[in-house]
Amino acid sequence: MTTPPPQLASAQNPSGDTPTWAMILGRLTTGQGLAPGQTAWAMDQIMTGTATPAQIAAFAVSMKMKRPTSAEVTELADIMLKHARRVPTDVIGTATVDIVGTGGDGANTVNLSTMAAIVVAAAGVPVVKHGNRAASSLSGGADTLEALGLRIDLGPDEVARCVAEVGIGFAFAPQFHPSYRHAGAVRREIGVPTVFNLLGPLTNPASPRAGLIGCAWADLAEVMAGVFATRGSSVLVVHGDDGLDELTTTTTSTIWRVQAGTVERLTFDPAAFGFARAHVSELTGGDAESNAASARAVLGGAKGPVRDAVVLNAAGALVAHAGLSSDAKWVPAWESGLARAKDAIDSGAAEQLLARWVRFTQQL
């Protein structure tokens, strides 16, 4: 009788032991972390359609309940990107910025990150926004952009052209992560946040090196920051202390500032920069048409709590982008970012950029 050859170690499975779902789920459901390569194996099974819906659901929920490590989430994101369609960066580069949140905060606010992205682009910083339709709220970023007249179904080359020509592009997640459809269907059926909520902000197909990344869970925001730190990104991972996955104007926010491979935790109070306290009800959104109307109003110069929150988040993204330069100072960067965000709206530049972006996508 011949002896089977020994299992060889690989980059995905450095221990050499063949992972199984029983092994992985057994560890997660007893609160144990996974060995290097095991998370990557599980995600590859999911992305290739090999995993069953029951296995996907059990993995997604138990990983979040266990609380994933940055190393585990890095493996999830890396495998997801391995299967993704990528936005070509030979022309637009990677000194771009994303403004996106995990969702799952249950607040159903207007699409602050979508409006802020337009303001940032109007301020002269190239934006590649990664987003999707609503999962738990009434309207996601994709829904609102579509209601504004944008074509959201663009492919990699077309998104790159938008960034090159207009200064902003939207990468609609299903177009770039077709292999994620297996997990996406299960995620919608489960209806509660899972570890997969963390992956959208970590898998932008244009690999922007800067970002304002909102996280609805304070304990997982630090995990996300750790992933960005391994990439050498300049990112502000933010969690409103009212629970929002944005920089909030209702109270303070906690910021994990990622720069040059390090993570620094800070408390940020918008009142220090002259912002009035808002009530979360003043930031509440509606369906896509309602949120599109709010966006048109803010970009058209309407004052009030929604504008304040948009300016604050746009400034945060500009601060993150400034952090790509090692000599960026915190307070001066905020002062500059706030001034640029306000001017982008008040000068009409943001409103004009949206109109130009819509026209450009319709002509592609």
UniProtKB/Swiss-Prot annotation:
Coiled coil: none annotated. It catalyses: N-(5-phospho-beta-D-ribosyl)anthranilate + diphosphate = 5-phospho-alpha-D-ribose 1-diphosphate + anthranilate. Its cofactor is Mg(2+). Pfam families: Glycos_trans_3N (PF02885), Glycos_transf_3 (PF00591). 5-phospho-alpha-D-ribose 1-diphosphate binds at residues 101, 104-105, 109, 111-114, 129-137, 141. Mg(2+) 2 binds at residues 245-246. Keywords: Amino-acid biosynthesis, Aromatic amino acid biosynthesis, Glycosyltransferase, Magnesium, Metal-binding, Transferase, Tryptophan biosynthesis. It comes from the Bacteria. One of its GO terms (cellular component) is cytosol. Its EC number is 2.4.2.18. Pathway: Amino-acid biosynthesis; L-tryptophan biosynthesis; L-tryptophan from chorismate: step 2/5. Binds 2 magnesium ions per monomer. One of its GO terms (biological process) is L-tryptophan biosynthetic process. GO terms for molecular function: anthranilate phosphoribosyltransferase activity; magnesium ion binding. Anthranilate 1 binds at residues 101, 132. Mg(2+) 1 binds at residues 113, 246. Anthranilate 2 binds at residue 187. Belongs to the anthranilate phosphoribosyltransferase family. Homodimer. Catalyzes the transfer of the phosphoribosyl group of 5-phosphorylribose-1-pyrophosphate (PRPP) to anthranilate to yield N-(5'-phosphoribosyl)-anthranilate (PRA). PANTHER family: ANTHRANILATE PHOSPHORIBOSYLTRANSFERASE (PTHR43285:SF2). This is Anthranilate phosphoribosyltransferase. The lineage of its organism: Bacteria, Bacillati, Actinomycetota, Actinomycetes, Mycobacteriales.
